[in-house]
Amino acid sequence: MRIVVSGGGTGGHIYPALAMIREIERRTPCEVLYIGTENGLEADIVRRAGIPFESIEISGIRRSLSFENVKTGFRFLKSVVRVRKLLRDFQPDIVVGTGGFVCGPVLYTAAKMGYKTLVHEQNSLPGITNKFLARYVDRVALSFKGSGHHFGKNKGKTILIGNPRASEVAMLQIDPVEEKRKYGFEQDRPLIVVYGGSRGAPAINKAVVDMIPKLTETDWSLLFVTGQVHYEDIQAQLGTLPDRIQLRPFIYDLPLILKASQLVISRSGASTLAELTTLGLPSILIPSPYVTENHQEVNASSLVETGASLLIRESELTGDRLFDACTKAIADQADMSKASLALGMPNAASDLVDELLRLIQRKN
């Protein structure tokens, strides 16, 4: 199997692609070519993963009228020429996009050249690039039930798959008792994990800092992942803390300790929600208000509606409100966990590869 993969800009587009690639490699001999940009995170992440990487020069379309969009149009045409050569040289069986503006010229060119094509949409609300590409590709893989209508007349091309990142988390061998022991947490105390993303989230951090005096009066444990940039300031603010409240700037193997937790406080990015539902974790979601079309709040809605999560908008976030939400979630943990697990799609990577193989066989 020869496959070209494109997706980039943020980890939310890259890590699902890598999860899919690893599942393909596990199941069948394959050759992979990844097409991204040098400015996106994919240039480093994909190369570090040992996957052949080629870059094109492309930028995103601005939603307002701008001369930059004219320049983007020229870059798009230039990229089409380069992608055409890369595809002719590599001769893939299928071309897959996982989101980000880099997918635009790659999947568009592949479809026009007659290659089988699929795009994977991680969010409930699709981005501009994937909505554009839906007109040309053979299949659109969805991560959230009910999001197909956003593709309009191309809804018939959609298939519910889930986020491949979930499959990697599902396959981890995790001993919750051992994970708590590593951090020095007592087994019989409910553990809350706060994670605002790799850079941290200042609004979440402030609310947690404000909540900690009340938290010390409970029997809860807290793992507070602040983000590298904020760690020293928060450490100075809080001073000496009891052992059951721990600060970390960042955690590389976060899913391991998540499995040992009873509640997670986080943003509602697509990969985060895939991890939470695969592990069946209750959550308090605080969507980022800084993302396109408020898609994180749309992502969170399916978890909130089924009782798997509580939602607090950042504009309404305070330490007291967060503490009250924690109290409710800890009390309702069993029901929220059951609802969360019911939304999980742990076989997403395998199901996605099955769909790729079906598309390839149809060609033949």
Curated annotation (Swiss-Prot):
Gene Ontology cellular-component annotations: plasma membrane
Molecular function via GO: UDP-N-acetyl-D-glucosamine:N-acetylmuramoyl-L-alanyl-D-glutamyl-meso-2,6-diaminopimelyl-D-alanyl-D-alanine-diphosphoundecaprenol 4-beta-N-acetylglucosaminlytransferase activity; undecaprenyldiphospho-muramoylpentapeptide beta-N-acetylglucosaminyltransferase activity
Entry membrane topology: Peripheral membrane protein
Keyword Cell wall biogenesis/degradation on entry: yes
Primary enzyme class: transferase
Residues holding UDP-N-acetyl-alpha-D-glucosamine: T10, G11, G12, N123, S198, I251, Q296
EC number: 2.4.1.227
UniProt keyword annotations, A-Z: Cell cycle, Cell division, Cell membrane, Cell shape, Cell wall biogenesis/degradation, Glycosyltransferase, Membrane, Peptidoglycan synthesis, Transferase
GO terms of biological process kind: carbohydrate metabolic process; cell division; cell wall organization; lipid glycosylation; peptidoglycan biosynthetic process; regulation of cell shape
Main location: membrane
Pathway(s): Cell wall biogenesis; peptidoglycan biosynthesis
Catalytic reaction equation(s): di-trans,octa-cis-undecaprenyl diphospho-N-acetyl-alpha-D-muramoyl-L-alanyl-D-glutamyl-meso-2,6-diaminopimeloyl-D-alanyl-D-alanine + UDP-N-acetyl-alpha-D-glucosamine = di-trans,octa-cis-undecaprenyl diphospho-[N-acetyl-alpha-D-glucosaminyl-(1->4)]-N-acetyl-alpha-D-muramoyl-L-alanyl-D-glutamyl-meso-2,6-diaminopimeloyl-D-alanyl-D-alanine + UDP + H(+)
Presence of the UniProt keyword Cell cycle in the record: yes
SUPFAM superfamilies (alphabetical): UDP-Glycosyltransferase/glycogen phosphorylase (SSF53756)
Compartments in which it is found: Cell membrane
Alphabetized Pfam families for the sequence: Glyco_tran_28_C (PF04101), Glyco_transf_28 (PF03033)
PANTHER family given in the database record: GLYCOSYLTRANSFERASE, UDP-N-ACETYLGLUCOSAMINE--N-ACETYLMURAMYL-(PENTAPEPTIDE) PYROPHOSPHORYL-UNDECAPRENOL N-ACETYLGLUCOSAMINE TRANSFERASE 1
The family this protein is said to belong to: Belongs to the glycosyltransferase 28 family. MurG subfamily.
Function: Cell wall formation. Catalyzes the transfer of a GlcNAc subunit on undecaprenyl-pyrophosphoryl-MurNAc-pentapeptide (lipid intermediate I) to form undecaprenyl-pyrophosphoryl-MurNAc-(pentapeptide)GlcNAc (lipid intermediate II).
HAMAP family reported for this sequence: MurG
Protein name listed in UniProt: UDP-N-acetylglucosamine--N-acetylmuramyl-(pentapeptide) pyrophosphoryl-undecaprenol N-acetylglucosamine transferase
Source species: Exiguobacterium sibiricum (strain DSM 17290 / CCUG 55495 / CIP 109462 / JCM 13490 / 255-15)
